[in-house]
């Protein structure tokens, strides 16, 4: 039974980290412990907590710089072992324990413009180091739908076999490099893996719906030029990511992770109705967008647990009460690759 609303961040995160029965079963049958590299991002803490709740007998290890005050202590309070390390350091990587299951979540997107050198280091150099260091592990890597080109909005979305030829922009191309570096070492060393080409996870504190809702409340126009997007509840995305550890391939291969596509206009109209405001639109829908085909994920995992109408209800309620925000816009409307 899904809640009607979240009274607090704690209640939100408790719901978001509740594992499915399928995940509990998957991790029960998965040999070895799990280490999350780059656990300190938007999704990492809840993924680690979900893993621990699903498999309390396993070691769940989170690795990050832990620059956010209180994050390490919060994770430890939920039974997650924490190791402070810089993943760009060979020496610090060498000191990490040998763990058979790796979830790689490190990367850089927001603020990429103006410091492209750091974007490429985080998204290409670090993956090469990690691939070498953990060649004997399974590696599930968080990637992005941005590795694909824009596709016709009537096409059903890019499948995993689509060419990795994104539109101009250094961020998207650095993400192709991340996959290609992991893929190189997977071919050379036989490392099993999977690239999670994620499209827009939804948390009440950030995400496409959060961005739209904030603009509606502020009376700002909604740009329709990127008129379509795939979105998925972050709890579902984390659940699928952890279950993917049982579906790694050698050599590593892609897997699209998201929910069905939405129309930005329709989502904004639905949120505006719930918020009691009138939407203001600007621009017109382009005939192409970053859309993914999720048939393979649906075959492996079944449909997402949380439907769109529930995400809309939750988002409108959260924003109307001026609850917490991460202050990290998705820039879903960007078509020029600049973030």
Task: Report the location of each language-model feature.
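Conserved glycine-rich Rossmann-like NAD(P)H-binding loop of the short-chain dehydrogenase/reductase
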Residues: 57-70
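NAD(P)H-binding glycine-rich loop region in Rossmannoid oxidoreductase-like domains
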Residues: 45, 69, 74-122
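N-terminal Rossmann NAD(P)H-binding glycine-rich loop of SDR-like oxidoreductase domains
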Residues: 35-52
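Short alpha-helix in the Rossmann-fold core of NAD(P)-dependent oxidoreductases
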Residues: 115, 119-127, 140, 174-175
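Amphipathic terminal alpha-helices
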Residues: 2-27, 308-339
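NAD(P)-dependent short-chain dehydrogenase/reductase
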Residues: 168, 176-230, 234-236, 271
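Conserved Rossmann-fold NAD(P)-dependent oxidoreductase catalytic core, especially the SDR/UDP-sugar
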Residues: 33, 101-105, 109, 125-170
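Mid/C-terminal beta-alpha module of Rossmann-like enzyme folds, strongest
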Residues: 220, 227, 240-296, 323, ...
């Amino acid at each position: 039974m899904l809640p009607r609303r979240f009274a607090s961040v704690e209640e939100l995160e408790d719901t978001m980290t509740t594992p499915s029965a399928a995940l509990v079963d998957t991790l029960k049958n998965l040999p070895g412990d799990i280490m999350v590299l780059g656990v300190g991002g938007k999704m990492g803490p809840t993924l680690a907590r979900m893993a621990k709740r699903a498999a309390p007998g396993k070691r769940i290890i989170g690795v990050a710089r832990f620059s956010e005050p209180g994050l390490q202590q919060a994770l430890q309070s939920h039974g997650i072992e924490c190791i402070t390390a810089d993943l760009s350091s060979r020496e610090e990587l060498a000191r990490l324990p040998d763990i058979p299951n790796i979830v790689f979540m490190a990367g850089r997107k927001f603020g990429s413009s103006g410091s492209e050198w750091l974007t490429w280091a985080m998204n290409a150099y670090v993956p090469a180091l990690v691939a070498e260091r953990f060649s004997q592990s399974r590696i599930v890597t968080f990637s992005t739908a941005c590795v694909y080109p824009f596709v016709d909005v009537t096409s059903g979305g890019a499948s995993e076999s689509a060419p990795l030829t994104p539109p101009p922009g250094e961020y998207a191309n650095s993400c192709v490099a991340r996959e290609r570096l992991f893929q190189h070492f997977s071919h050379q060393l036989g490392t099993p893996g999977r690239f999670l080409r994620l499209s827009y996870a939804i948390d009440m504190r950030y995400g496409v719906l959060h961005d739209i809702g904030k603009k509606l409340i502020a009376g700002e126009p909604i740009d329709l030029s990127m008129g379509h997007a795939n979105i998925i509840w972050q709890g579902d995305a984390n659940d699928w990511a952890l279950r993917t550890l049982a579906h790694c391939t050698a050599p590593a291969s892609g897997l699209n992770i998201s929910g069905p596509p939405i129309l930005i206009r329709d989502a904004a109209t639905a949120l505006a109705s719930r918020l009691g405001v009138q939407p203001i639109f600007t621009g017109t829908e382009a005939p192409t967008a970053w859309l993914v085909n999720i048939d393979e994920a649906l075959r492996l995992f079944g449909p997402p647990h949380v439907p769109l109408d529930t995400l809309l209800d939750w988002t409108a309620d959260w924003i109307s009460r001026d609850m917490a925000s991460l202050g990290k816009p998705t820039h879903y409307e960007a078509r020029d690759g600049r973030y």
